[in-house]
Amino acid sequence: MAKPYDPKDFYYRKAKKEGLRARSAFKIDEILRRHRLLRKGQAVLDLGAAPGGFLQILADEVGETGVAVGVDLEPVRRLGKPWVKTAIVDLLSPGALDQIRTLHAGPFQLVTSDMAPKTIGVKITDEARSLELVRMALDVAEKTLAPGGAFVAKVFMGGEFPVLKKELQARFDEVHVIRPEAVRESSYEVYVLGKGLRRAAARAAPTANATPTPTSTSTSTPTSTSTPTSTSTSTPAPTLTQTQTQTPKKPARRAPAKASTAGKAKAKTGASRRTR
C-alpha cells in the first residue's frame, strides 16, 4: 500500500539541506547520471523551469562554457550564473520559439520538461492533460533540438501512454521509461527519455540557428535573377526578324499582276489558301 502524501518527505528535506529549490533536482540528476545526456559546453533548454530544480542541475552539467535556458509561465529566480538565461514564455503563444531563440540562437543538445497539469483528482482527465503538455514539449523539442539530441519529459502513466511511446519511437533512436527514486510512491508519474533525435524528425533545428536565414534569402536571389534570363530568352527580336523577312515578299506577290491572266489566277488561288 502506498504511503500517504507527505510534502516534507526525505527528498524534500534533502533538497532544502543541499540548497536545491525543489526535490525534482534529484530526479533529473539521476536521469543524467544513468544516461550521460550532457557535456560541458553544450546547450540545454528546460521547459516549465520554475522554481528551478531542474535548472540548477542542468546548469552545473553544461558549466560556464555552455548555456542553460529555462522558460516558464512564472518567473524563475536568478541562479547567479551568467550562462543561465531565463524568461517568462507561454509555449502556446505564436512567438514562443522566437522568445527562446533570443535567449539562445543555436540548437540544443537536450530539451527537458517537468511540466505538470493542475490535477483535479480525476485520473483519466489528469492523464490526458499531462499527455497534452508532453506533446507540446515534444513539438518544441523537434524545432529546437540538434539532430542526435535528447528529450526528457514528465508524464502521468495511463491508458494512452503506449501511444505516446510509439510517437517517441518514431522520432528517436532509443526510448526509455524511467521512474527516478525521488518520485513519491503515491505518484503515477514517470519520465520518458528519447535519445538520438533522427534527422528527419528535427524539423526546425537548423532554423534554430540564426545563420540559415540569410542562406534562404540568398537562395531566393538567383530565382529573381533568373527572371531577366527567361525574359531575354523570350525576347521578341526573332519574331520581328520573321516579320521583316515576310515584308519583302509583298512586292514579289505584286509582280505577277503585270503578267498573264494565268498568273493572276495563280495569285488568287494562293490567296484563297492563305484565307483557309
From Swiss-Prot:
Top EC class, one word:
transferase
Q: What is its EC number?
A: 2.1.1.166
Q: State the reactions this protein catalyses.
A: uridine(2552) in 23S rRNA + S-adenosyl-L-methionine = 2'-O-methyluridine(2552) in 23S rRNA + S-adenosyl-L-homocysteine + H(+)
- InterPro entries in UniProt: RNA_methyltr_RlmE (IPR050082), RNA_MeTrfase_FtsJ_dom (IPR002877), rRNA-MeTfrase_E (IPR015507), SAM-dependent_MTases_sf (IPR029063)
Q: Name one GO molecular function term.
A: rRNA (uridine-2'-O-)-methyltransferase activity
Locations of Low complexity compositional bias? 203-249
Instruction: Tell me the segments the record calls region Disordered.
Output: 203-276
Task: Spell out the subcellular localization from the entry.
Answer: Cytoplasm
Q: Does the keyword Cytoplasm apply?
A: yes
GO cellular component terms, semicolon-separated: cytoplasm
Q: What is this protein called?
A: Ribosomal RNA large subunit methyltransferase E
Organism for this UniProt entry: Anaeromyxobacter sp. (strain Fw109-5)
The organism that produces this protein has a lineage beginning with: Bacteria, Pseudomonadati, Myxococcota, Myxococcia, Myxococcales
